[in-house]
Amino acid sequence: MKMLIRISLLLFVVTGFAGCSEEFNGQFPVNKATPSQVTVLPDGVTNFAGGATITYQLPDETDLLYVKAVYQLPDGSMREEKASAFSNSVTLRGFGRSTVAYVKLITVDRSRNESQPVEVEIHTEDSPIYGIFESLDVNEGWGGFTLQWNNPLKENIVVSVMRLNDENVYENIETFYSAATSVYQPVRGLDPIPADFGIFVRDTYQNYTDTLKLNMKPWFEMMLDRNKFIPIPLSSKFTISVYGTSNLTVLWDGIVTNNGPNGIYYINAGAYNPYFAINLGVKAKLSRFRYWSRTDYYFRLHSAKEIQIYGTNDPLVGNNPESDNSEWILLNPEIFVSVRPSGLDPSVPATGEDYDYALDGEEWEFPWEVPAVQWLRFQQLSTWTGTMAMTCNEIRFWGEPQSE
């Protein structure tokens, strides 16, 4: 008998839980009265690129919960946007090319009763992706090619880069996500042989532009062999901080997350803009370089804000730490300027976006016309906080070594 009672109780509990899982989780309707409709104002429709905003007058309903807008996109999919009872407008997005669409505005009360719909006609403008696509500028470059585009409305977009494979099918090789107003984006790691490429832009609503098709031949480049680098002694103008190391080779040890005194090259400069020099071990036409600052002080303290790089093939100049800049060749007539993605003040620690950007290394390209050189002088013109010291974590150079 005890066993029978236990089984009965267990069945009751299981049945009870099963029943609870199917119950409505929320407020049951307290009435079935149909709420009143919204009143769309005479100038209540504001059309914009990719959508529209509808402004209306709310009904006098004490239990109004929200207003929903139901509409169909050109691809046939249905969308629904909701605006709270404290708002008198609803914004609709997701349209591609300019179109006429009809929107149903429906009020919903706390009992989930719905009003009769009010139909509103909107005339959307082209999505921003088409203007972005028209602004797209593509040029052959080192190790691939470069993309530039303008996005004045800061639309969240995706730029996809494809290459025609041996089966005559375009396959994706790069995908870039951005909402920045102006973008310069290299595509790297490609062989220096002619190939067919395709580029298109889409938004987060799956609207696509046409595909720009180009045949391009990337310029050859390779990362210079760091094992060949030879450090040049530091100028007597400067001293090494006790918080850093005098071993210049830490700048090409392959570790980009150094913080301690044994991993950071740290110069106290005084009245002069700090610099150091390297013998690359090979004469090379440089294409670009990448710079990493001290990890725990990204975009702060002694992190470089402005950089200039000089080169020479004269060993008497290159090996002399006291040689004047006038004896060297300036390789970047336009100063390399560090850019902080967040745009925040240096007094504010790096955001997640800042950190990820800096951890990947900040990169600059050399002009095409720079001569091939063997010695480099790296000079910091300013820091993010205006200090006269330099902290550097890692540097890497790419280019084309010259045969003797």
Q: Which ranges hold each PLM region?
A:
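Short beta-strand segments within Ig-like beta-sandwich modules, predominantly Fibronectin type-III
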Residues: 80-86, 172-180, 355-357
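Aromatic, loop-rich ligand-recognition surfaces of beta-strand-rich domains
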Residues: 258-325, 360-404
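Disordered, acidic Ser/Thr/Pro-rich linker "stalks" and the adjacent N-terminal cap
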Residues: 215-283, 294-295, 299, 345-347, ...
